[in-house]
């Protein structure tokens, strides 16, 4: 399998052909300020994220059209939007800051694509389109067949000879014409249960592959939808659930 350093800057290598958002890598507050300006802020909205992180930690959105007043009265306290001034103040609290990425903001449709592959050859591929996304969590989605999205991911899988279970995150630009790869996660993704609901149980199939068992030919049930809802549960003083 080709060695891919964790700090490899793929867009600097035109041979890979991978379409990614325009971005800058920064290590200091001053470099971040320069990157924000170079990428078009305040005319353009931007995303600022830690190069190493998970679960939406270290990610904020810069949008000059959203005021602090609007954030206070119209956004929940866990909003991902932040003002430029607050971002600079926050990052200036320490003498050093971790590597960060300043990138163009992609407001279009979000896709997650899950794979089970055999050393670069895809065995199963399931793509999920986000219908309602809140702080990077798909609250509702549909399993659909998007050839453009799957083709981009498949090229990466074959180029890097990826193996086992893993997943991609992609975002479209504002007019939903162009998909961009945002992340490649070398693990089972949090939304893989939706693939199982659509008839392709990737964790189970991954175990069968490792055990050398034959794998069935499967096609996802396109159109399968997931809607995440929260429901209160009530218990008595002894901890027994109340059904009423």
Task: Identify the function of each model-found stretch.
Residues 3-99:
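Active-site nucleotide/adenylate-binding loops and adjacent lid/helix of ATP-dependent enzymes
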Residues 26-29, 110, 147, 200:
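Electropositive phosphate-/nucleotide-binding environments in soluble metabolic enzymes
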Residues 40, 52-53, 105-109, 161-164:
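A short catalytic or substrate-binding loop motif that flags glycine-/basic-rich loops and adjacent residues
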Residues 43-44, 98, 109-111, 164-166:
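Short beta-strand or tight-loop elements
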Residues 61-63, 117, 197-199:
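Short, glycine/charged-enriched secondary-structure capping and boundary segments
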Residues 57, 72-154, 172, 179-180:
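Phosphate-binding site of ATP-dependent enzymes
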Residues 131-136, 142-244:
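ATP-dependent carboxylate activation and anion-phosphoryl transfer catalytic cores
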Residues 27, 104, 166:
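Short loop/edge segments at beta-strand edges and connector loops
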């Amino acid at each position: 399998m080709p060695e891919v350093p964790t700090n490899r800057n793929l867009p600097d290598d035109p041979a890979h052909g991978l379409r990614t958002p325009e971005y800058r890598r920064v290590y200091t507050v001053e470099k971040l300020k320069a990157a924000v300006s170079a990428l078009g802020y305040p005319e353009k909205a931007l995303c600022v994220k830690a190069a190493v992180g998970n679960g939406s930690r270290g990610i904020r959105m810069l949008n000059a059209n959203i005021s602090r007043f609007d954030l206070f009265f119209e956004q929940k306290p866990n909003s991902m939007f932040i003002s430029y001034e607050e971002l600079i103040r926050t990052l200036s609290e320490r003498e050093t800051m971790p590597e960060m990425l300043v990138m163009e903001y992609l407001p279009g449709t979000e896709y997650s694509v899950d794979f089970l592959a055999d050393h670069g050859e895809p065995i199963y591929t399931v793509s999920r389109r986000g219908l309602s996304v809140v702080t990077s969590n798909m609250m509702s989605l549909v399993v659909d067949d998007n050839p453009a999205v799957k083709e981009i991911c498949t090229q990466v899988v074959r180029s890097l000879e990826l193996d086992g279970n893993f997943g991609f995150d992609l975002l479209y630009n504002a007019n939903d014409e162009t998909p961009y790869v945002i992340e490649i996660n070398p693990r089972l993704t949090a939304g893989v249960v939706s693939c199982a609901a659509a008839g392709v149980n990737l964790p189970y199939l991954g175990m069968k592959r490792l055990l050398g068992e034959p794998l069935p030919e499967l096609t996802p049930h396109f159109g399968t939808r997931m809607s995440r809802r929260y429901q209160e549960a009530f218990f008595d003083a002894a901890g027994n659930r109340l059904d009423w």
